[in-house]
């Protein structure tokens, strides 16, 4: 028996293949696969259930129906193996060959393969250079095509209708040949000589001028080269022989009642065979042409339906009106082969049950019901029972387990000890959704889960279910214990903060313990140790919140790393002293000597992990939880209706607001304000009233007045249960309390606009009918949103995982000096994220110098940990270059140094870590917390957005960034450049705030001047755009003719007159060509030049510009010549939340994107056309000038004669990522996407490390477009993988040849996934048909480099613990293979197996 097992093991080893290739099958290849031709459409005999001969289930072709038994029953048993029965012709062998043996159908007329015909772009059409429409007309017998023109005037491939064909026949007789149907296409394809075509097109390409024609020829050239290189022949796209799937893969099962359940494929095959046989008969009978044609067309249609039903025309339906499932449908979609069976499999040794709380468990334990454990660990139990001699055979062991003998439980305890199980909760959004625990046997039927891991699973106990999986092999147990154990997953992989932070009851309990109250029992006592304080509490001498003095002992680590004990007396409370008992040695008492809210506890755990390491943190977290639960019980905090205290001021505040609203209403009726203004003001009034009410309510709730020891009144924080819950962060928030005890406030309509009558009642008072009705809108919308959100978020995660799945850390250091420049993130002047948070856990790319010196502070390649970040802060460094995966030079992966710290472990990342998947999960997992709405900015929001000054928040020194300025007559600076920024820096040189200021800003302070907090340092007019002069002189009007190019207007209120330039459209014909401008001249009338240039100082005036000067008026530097009114920007919808993140990662172009300058140079405007203006940029160095047509309604930021830098904004709008990449480079686009994505997440309070977003961006930038091919084999304009081009260039440079140049390209994540090198990965993602068609034509081979491909072929993934296995294989492939064991063929193997089985049978 042993030999038998050994032999079976040897069999099951798969061939060690290096890759998978896909191609077109030639008719001969199909015949070589086949074991016989299927000639009849019959399936099985309905009486005997035996397969019909030569039918679709024929045993002669496909193999026997029963193991080792022929159909007629003449040969049975193993000894006749391999005999072919002379009576029924069936080979005696195993039934499983019916899963692998194929048949074939010889088609009476060739048929086009629908994939190569209809999947766009049509491969057959491209090959023949004909349109799809024409080819279809030939294939479906509507017109003829010329195959051999002979000496006639016809051309090969020309279409002829029936009439044209008959005319041509009369004219030329049989000089020429024209046919219809697939035969014609077949002959055309066969006539193509690939090599000649390639040569011709390669010669033709350089001489082509028209862009479209060049594109077309390049496409065709690529296709023909693909065919030529892969060895596929074009005529194989037309089928002459159709393969038939093995019958066990399209089963037919008899149901009771004489009916059959069958796979749709059988119906489709029957159709094909029927039509094929009929066509053969018709051809034998020499039937009339029209009948044969019709039959051929029907055959073509039936083969189309078999291969891909519904791609052409209506889908063929079965008896119950549903479309039949064709071969293509079998592999694509969520239910197809790839996603259903290859990527998602069901698992043995698993169970699921409801979860309940296990508050007494340790962090690494879970409670497993005995029943479940018994079932899951059965094989182990059987083995143990047999091993202990309690059962003689496996059967006996089985009986014992079924009877549940007492011994079984002892064995079960033994088996379970130290054997981790894995718990999983669906949906598994990130890797913390599966963790390993040690099982503890419990009574009952529910799994017990440790409360602290709920946050990671996102689990609650309202009926959630979880699945249990058992790792079987020793290796699997080892991995589960060392990598997946819940105690090893304390930090979140998304942001590196603890994920096992207490919540809810625990927080409430700890908060209650650490609160203090005035004049509590035992106040003022002093204790000589914590133990004494505890004793006082236990005996009731002092209560938990009493303010007392306690002497505590702390263990601290000094500079030398020695542990030193210190003792001191602190003012604290009894409760906090009790907390110090569970505080691990080495942490300071100050950490718990405060009100312990959720944030404080989280910080405490984080500090503990960073200072004391994993083990202490785990023990401490458990202790915190037990303590929290205990004191939450003791506190007796509960919610009663009287806890919701309504403030007395509420009613007066509401009455005041109502009065104000009435007043506005009257103003509106007397026509003083517009309807829009009234609406906005009313909303404002109610919003502020709501704020006031909630403030009054919170003041009321949060403090109470008590009598202290001296008999005086003293305010203390309230012990109101609802307030405590909200304040500690256990449950609820100020906004929710406001609805309970304040007023509900303004509600939104279903379309998102705000209803102007608010709900003034709260839940304690109760709502009346109309208020309740208004409330239902929001509630329903919320639920509908949630449902949509979940699906959308899941789909985003799927796309992200797919694009990043093959990114793995594969080397230690790529040695690049490149990196991203990190600065503190500043929004609206505030520092949102300081530099230390952005660079923590990164590697420095270039030496960082001490500010103002040449001394190296941080050497290159240092991993910045907490200590280094303190150094950065102390030396007030405000920017540094750190390594990033975006600039990593590793091919097909990244290096550890460019990635930096593994966030979930806290050290530099290991090789083989699948950072792509981690990044995708970290971004996708919080997706469900993001909103789905698009915000309309209307009313209140848009009014606030028109800023007109900068008010500083911190005192410091003023600095200007890329700003040009002139000094006006008052000595103030006027900014004359775009995209200038002001920064405020403190005395250490750290940047505190930063503001963008527009052109024409007047600064109140000079550069490097000190500013005070709250000072206004810059002003500008938000509604008009000035034109500032840079020289002093007097004005001279050119082409300014009243009534032709301008008009004079007088303001009624002020009596001042101003000149308004007319828009081109409004001018009379005489003024159409004129260009009104103001020239500045010196006193003698000579032209003035702009300082430092040879350009005369003249300013062109665009339409609608307002000039407040007269001709020949004197003017100073920095004065405004003219003002251009800005239309208030239309209220744009701001896409927020999930859709915004998806847009960024899909790199979608916004509707009206900002227009950026393509080159650096000087702006001028050319001749205008209808509705558009022509913008011309002339580069300073000479060279071609660049022109662009811009619609008139776009607000331009530039005037004639102004200089712009490449990539500067010319017309406002949302910027398109593609433009940023093209004009400002890869680092800018990376920063843009990272910051925009982070903005969305930050708004929801979700923290994600920038690294993860950068990983996805790296994958979006994988491809490039070849600009100049050099000596490489790429084509210009071709899309190629960057690493491929880099490798090819290295080889070319080594040979001293010309390398290819390329432009990086930004692809959206869906596009990038579909464009990966691996066709298996792309096909299992989306658009399966298109991907496989393209791969087959190019004869692509998949090197199985990514994770997905390896999962699909059933290997270990090349990441994590499977990384070394793949490394070894790669090394083995490089070394010549050692002497292999003699290969054994399948037939020999079966022979050996049979002999062994016979031996085994006889020895029983």
Swiss-Prot record:
Organism whose genome encodes this protein: Shewanella piezotolerans (strain WP3 / JCM 13877)
InterPro entries: DNA-dir_RpoC_beta_prime (IPR045867), DNA-dir_RpoC_beta_prime_bact (IPR012754), RNA_pol_asu (IPR000722), RNA_pol_N (IPR006592), RNA_pol_Rpb1_1 (IPR007080), RNA_pol_Rpb1_3 (IPR007066), RNA_pol_Rpb1_3_sf (IPR042102), RNA_pol_Rpb1_4 (IPR007083)
Residues the record lists as binding Mg(2+): 460, 462, 464
Residues given in the record as Zn(2+) 1 binding sites: 70, 72, 85, 88
Name recorded for this polypeptide: DNA-directed RNA polymerase subunit beta'
Subunit structure: The RNAP catalytic core consists of 2 alpha, 1 beta, 1 beta' and 1 omega subunit. When a sigma factor is associated with the core the holoenzyme is formed, which can initiate transcription.
Binding site for Zn(2+) 2: 814, 888, 895, 898
Keyword Metal-binding attributed: yes
Co-factor requirement: Mg(2+); Zn(2+)
Family: Belongs to the RNA polymerase beta' chain family.
Stated role: DNA-dependent RNA polymerase catalyzes the transcription of DNA into RNA using the four ribonucleoside triphosphates as substrates.
Keyword Ribonucleoprotein: no
A Gene Ontology molecular function term of the record: DNA-directed RNA polymerase activity
Annotated GO biological process: DNA-templated transcription
The protein's Enzyme Commission number: 2.7.7.6
Reaction catalysed by this enzyme: RNA(n) + a ribonucleoside 5'-triphosphate = RNA(n+1) + diphosphate
Example of a GO cellular component annotation carried by this entry: DNA-directed RNA polymerase complex
Highest taxon listed in the record's lineage: Bacteria
Enzyme class, UniProt record, top EC level: transferase
Keywords associated with the record: DNA-directed RNA polymerase, Magnesium, Metal-binding, Nucleotidyltransferase, Transcription, Transferase, Zinc
UniProt cross-references to PANTHER family, sorted A to Z: DNA-DIRECTED RNA POLYMERASE, DNA-DIRECTED RNA POLYMERASE SUBUNIT BETA
Cofactor binding remark: Binds 1 Mg(2+) ion per subunit. Binds 2 Zn(2+) ions per subunit.
